[in-house]
Swiss-Prot record:
<keyword id="KW-0436">Ligase</keyword>
<keyword id="KW-0030">Aminoacyl-tRNA synthetase</keyword>
<dbReference type="GO" id="GO:0005737">
    <property type="term" value="C:cytoplasm"/>
</dbReference>
<keyword id="KW-0547">Nucleotide-binding</keyword>
<comment type="subunit">
    <text>Homodimer.</text>
</comment>
<dbReference type="InterPro" id="IPR004522">
    <property type="entry name" value="Asn-tRNA-ligase"/>
</dbReference>
<dbReference type="InterPro" id="IPR002312">
    <property type="entry name" value="Asp/Asn-tRNA-synth_IIb"/>
</dbReference>
<dbReference type="GO" id="GO:0005524">
    <property type="term" value="F:ATP binding"/>
</dbReference>
<protein>
    <recommendedName>
        <fullName>Asparagine--tRNA ligase</fullName>
        <ecNumber>6.1.1.22</ecNumber>
    </recommendedName>
</protein>
<dbReference type="GO" id="GO:0004816">
    <property type="term" value="F:asparagine-tRNA ligase activity"/>
</dbReference>
<keyword id="KW-0067">ATP-binding</keyword>
<dbReference type="InterPro" id="IPR006195">
    <property type="entry name" value="aa-tRNA-synth_II"/>
</dbReference>
<dbReference type="InterPro" id="IPR004365">
    <property type="entry name" value="NA-bd_OB_tRNA"/>
</dbReference>
<dbReference type="GO" id="GO:0006421">
    <property type="term" value="P:asparaginyl-tRNA aminoacylation"/>
</dbReference>
<dbReference type="InterPro" id="IPR012340">
    <property type="entry name" value="NA-bd_OB-fold"/>
</dbReference>
<keyword id="KW-0963">Cytoplasm</keyword>
<dbReference type="InterPro" id="IPR004364">
    <property type="entry name" value="Aa-tRNA-synt_II"/>
</dbReference>
Amino acid sequence: MSKFPTISEILSGKVAVGEEVAVRGWVRTRRDSKAGLSFLAVYDGSCFDPIQAIINNDLSNYQDEVLRLTAGCSVIVTGVIVESPAEGQAVELQAKSVEVVGWVEDPDTYPMAAKRHSIEYLREVAHLRPRTNLIGAVARVRHCLAQAIHRFFHEQGFYWVATPLITASDTEGAGEMFRVSTLDLENLPRGEDGKVDFSQDFFGRESFLTVSGQLNGETYACALSKVYTFGPTFRAENSNTTRHLAEFWMVEPEFAFATLADNAKLAEDMLKYVFRAVLEERKDDLKFFEKHIDNTVISRLENFINSDFAQIDYTDAIEVLLKSGKNFEFPVEWGIDLSSEHERFLAEEYFKSPVVVKNYPKDIKAFYMRLNDDGKTVAAMDVLAPGIGEIIGGSQREERLEVLDKRMVEMGLNPEDYWWYRDLRRYGTVPHSGFGLGFERLIVYVTGLQNIREVIPFPRAPRNANF
């Protein structure tokens, strides 16, 4: 074992009692006893719990430095691991020396002083908030989920593909995109029609930040069979809500020779895999969320893992909602996009389990979703989870060129703008499917937090791009 083990390694028993180590971290709290001892709670972020260091007053720098330590000071505490007589901790560190690496300039004005801070306040000091129990736990859970996603797809034979962040394509056809340009805003070049001449821009045409890696992912799925993307995406929606971000991460698998049923099975397997991983690897953080944020966090994940996914056609789901007797805020009729209240009723009250709603009306779904034989619906699906509603959206992709072209025209898109996407249907077309998982929504579900801005390090939202 290294002379500098992490606190996680020490507390998990990987360091033997009696071994001398040096712990590097930051002071959470200092407590002094009348017996001439000081107790330092030191954390390094490797796990939720700090380690307690016992400092005797015979250390040479005890009076001048140890007694001045406050929350946030960085230290290297060298000592021996001993069994702890106190409840709640198996071992502690009997210090032989304390080296102060960095002081907190003014403890009275330190933004992360040892007290409870509101979540709203923490957003104002996003550069310091990972030092709190809450955001530190979120960061570790986020890492665990990301690693589990990569492991799952690797084990399933999927290849990770890096899709571009700068694009000329609007995957959703919604137009809510951030433009990328190097043109001088004070002196825009214009054509004879008075419109901005983007041929003089950096890329020689209009370009945007991507809203999805899906279309690019499909190109590789039609060559490598099974691929996935995992990266940032951007939406210029002017939505200042607890559910929306302008910059967020998406997980988007695409696989060839796959039907909508295959897609639903992959989504179920992936969610259960990552939930098992976080329950096994981050129980310490989940217990914190269970105690302080949402007391159903752990049981909800366990119930999800042990539940069989229900499946229902959109048309039948509308019937269920109409017959429910519920007075929904948004009226129910065939052709609407299900709102959050509709989704949660289906998952939480009707099925009491995760549910896949499939075969939605074509007019409320994207152009690339495969048209069903009825001509009215597409082979789309949403995975609804108790406690949050939609967590995954996907579809079987339209592999027939003539149908794809017709759908594009219906939705006001120019097929020629998607010439490369159409080529996939011209050269060895194949049925294929995929879905999108909003990574931050997954973290919200796992942690029980109510605002999506708490689960990404530096949230980007309307009129908010600090740090």
